[in-house]
């Protein structure tokens, strides 16, 4: 036990802190940029000739992330706050068994879980650094997905330790599966989408959100099904996002498109701008 504690202590002592990032000089105090990243499936292996889509592995996903993030950030305004929502299924697998934890569906993986987790943390660190260069403060939330019910926690805790000395970054460690944030008269929500239909999500939020009645502009993100859809449900604007990842062998049986985007919200008027990159190579 003492040897294990010693190894853990050495690992945390070697965890480098986030380096300082220059504060942007001119930001809009009434704006909040939201980057919803759903279904990244980091560590997935896909062969385009088999799937009818593009190839996918860790190296290609890294290039896609760097290129896509740069494109949407170039369009979005500099804002008081940015929110990076990792909306579940950040990693394709949860362990080295290469199966979905609940249904035991076999997964095509590109690497062992140690490398997948390490490289996933590194690319999210890159994303946080880029977002912080343009926005005054950044909030990070890592949500559970059906592919990563445990590994998402390791990534969240790693990001919290990395940003501990950075006052402009907050890692939201709320253990609930629902993300909720108020921005003036605007409310933003997120949930992976595998355990609740959109109508039920709207009813649930109206019941439990403490600032629901204060915000006439309400927006919710989900993912999971890898197919874009949007609907006005009661007082909620619900959107199921297109995935970051392309199709794998299983997903090739239906049509989906990839995308990465930033939504800009005004604290009084709700969503005012959307920047989308289709992640085409």
Predicted ranges, named:
Residues 132, 158-177, 182-281:
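Conserved beta-sheet core of the metallophosphoesterase superfamily
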Residues 14-23, 68, 200-211:
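Short, motif-level signal for alpha-helix interfacial/capping segments enriched in acidic residues
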Residues 20-40, 48-171:
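Core catalytic region of metal-dependent phosphoesterases/phosphodiesterases
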Residues 12, 109-110, 266:
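Short, structured coil/loop segments at alpha-helix boundaries
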Residues 1-28, 64:
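Long, contiguous juxta-domain segments that are non-catalytic but functionally important
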Residues 44-47, 249:
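A generic structural signal for short coil/turn motifs at secondary-structure boundaries
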């Amino acid at each position: 036990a003492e040897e294990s504690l010693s190894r853990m202590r050495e690992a945390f002592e070697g965890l480098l802190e986030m380096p300082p990032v220059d504060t942007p000089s001119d930001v809009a105090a009434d704006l909040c940029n939201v980057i919803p990243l759903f279904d990244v499936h980091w560590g997935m292996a896909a062969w385009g000739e088999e799937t009818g889509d593009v190839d996918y592995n860790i190296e290609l996903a890294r290039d896609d992330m760097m290129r896509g993030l740069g494109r949407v950030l170039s369009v979005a305004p500099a804002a008081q706050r940015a929110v990076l929502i990792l909306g579940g299924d950040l990693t394709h697998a949860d362990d080295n068994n290469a199966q979905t934890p609940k249904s035991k569906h076999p997964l095509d993986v590109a690497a062992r879980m140690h490398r997948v987790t390490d490289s996933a943390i590194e690319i999210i660190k890159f994303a946080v650094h880029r977002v912080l260069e343009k926005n005054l403060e950044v909030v990070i939330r890592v949500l559970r997905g059906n592919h990563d019910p445990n590994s998402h926690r390791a990534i969240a805790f790693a990001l919290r330790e990395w940003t501990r000395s950075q006052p402009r970054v907050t890692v939201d460690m709320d253990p609930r599966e629902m993300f909720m944030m108020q921005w003036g008269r605007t409310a933003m929500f997120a949930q992976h989408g595998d355990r609740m239909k959109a109508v039920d999500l709207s009813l649930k939020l109206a019941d439990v959100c403490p600032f629901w009645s204060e915000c006439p502009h309400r927006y919710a993100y989900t993912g999971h099904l890898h197919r874009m859809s949007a609907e006005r449900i009661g007082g909620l604007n619900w959107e199921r996002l297109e995935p970051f990842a392309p199709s794998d062998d299983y997903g090739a049986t239906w049509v989906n498109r990839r995308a990465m985007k930033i939504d800009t919200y005004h604290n009084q008027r709700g969503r005012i701008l959307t920047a989308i990159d289709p992640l085409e190579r």
